Amino acid sequence: MTLPAATVIVVSRHRAAELARCLMALAQQDHPQIEVIVVADPAGIEAAKATGLPLKLLHFDEANISAARNLGLSAAAGEMVAFIDDDAVAEPTWLSRLCGALARPDVVAATGFVRGRNGISFQWKACEVDALGLDHPLPDDATTYPGAPARAVKTQGTNCAFRRPALLSIGGFDPAFRFYLDYADVNLRLAGHGLTAVVPDAQVHHGFAASVRRRADRVPTDLHEIAASIAVFLRRHAPEALEAETIPAIEAQRRRLADLRRARRISEPEAERLAASLAAGWDDGMARPLSPLAALVPTAPGFMALPETGPRRGAVISGRIWQRAALMKQARIARAEGRVVTVICLAPSPRAHRVAFTDHGIWLQTGGLFGWSTREGPRLRLAPFTRRIAEETARIAPLRPVL
């Protein structure tokens, strides 16, 4: 199957190092015809330039991710347009899997699964979102779903793709959503245009880097924009819910604060400050002007292909923890040859496994020979080294090349 040309849009602000790593992973995609647009602040633009990759670079330094995405969308030239966060890295097969699902003419959107900070456990799978902004889990199968104005498949913001003409026609992203629920709003507005595909094997790793709104451990530092977006979402999609005594999505945030306080992850003054930001954000969202969304006008000067993407050979390099320096040296040589490289470096221990994408563009899996990787089944895995390497190689083979 010939894959349609695709544009990947990455919005970045105050995360230059993470952006560079994200772009390095995109350069290893097996999709043969992609362009990458970076919409970023000055530091992000400089980090993108330093990669040496031919990228469309758009300067944007405002705290409004929807407006930034619209800027990138207008400049996109691919038939399909995909989005990934700057603190995420994509498996080499990610984009081709999403675009493969979009090759069906009745599919207008596609979303995949997201692995969390340990690089193995899933952070997000498939779910629907309703008009109240609440999520509802879906089966893990690869399938397509029709949508409705009050309920649609939720495309995860760090792992999704759309038919560009369809997304342009609905006005792209609503700038009233400066952060949070921006994709849920798109999903409900796009629901009548076609099916949404759930593609479990289209995977990214999402690190949840620190930002102005959260710490590196995912504890929030400000809830203003979350509350504002909840208010805007209800005004757009369920205005009758504003008359209710309680707002479920706001109550969920209050429970979140209570849970964090009980776990002693935030202090009482921090909890009070976060609660105040939640209330102020709600008032802001209720007062925020809402304008009709007109179709976006494309401004793309032409398709700027990222060179040397497409299918390539892989390599799995394995060894013991005391061999790590030699393994990484071997991996850098294989990477310089153009391969997608995975290093599996194990210690004689029961430590759980982790996977990371290094600054050298190498997939590094570490942990104990007897530790679990998938967080399923027994924690202690009694297996000889060669069998364990074979098992882990088989686990990753559907996602990235191993030979």
Regions found by a protein language model. Name each.
Residues D130-A152:
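Short, flexible, basic/aromatic active-site loop/helix in glycosyltransferases
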Residues M1-A25, P311-I317, R388-L403:
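N-proximal low-complexity "stem/linker" segments adjacent to membrane-targeting elements
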Residues K154-G171, A176-A202:
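A short, conserved alpha-helix in the catalytic core of glycosyltransferases
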Residues V81:
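Short aromatic/hydrophobic "clamp" motif used to bind/position activated sugar donors
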Residues M24-Q33, R335-A336:
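Short, acidic, metal-binding catalytic loop of nucleotide-sugar glycosyltransferases
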Residues F60-A76:
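Glycine-rich, basic loop-to-helix element that forms the pyrophosphate-binding segment
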Residues L242-R313, I389-L403:
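Non-catalytic, C-terminal membrane-associated alpha-helical segments of glycosyltransferases
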Residues P92-V129:
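Conserved donor NDP-sugar-binding/catalytic core segment of glycosyltransferases
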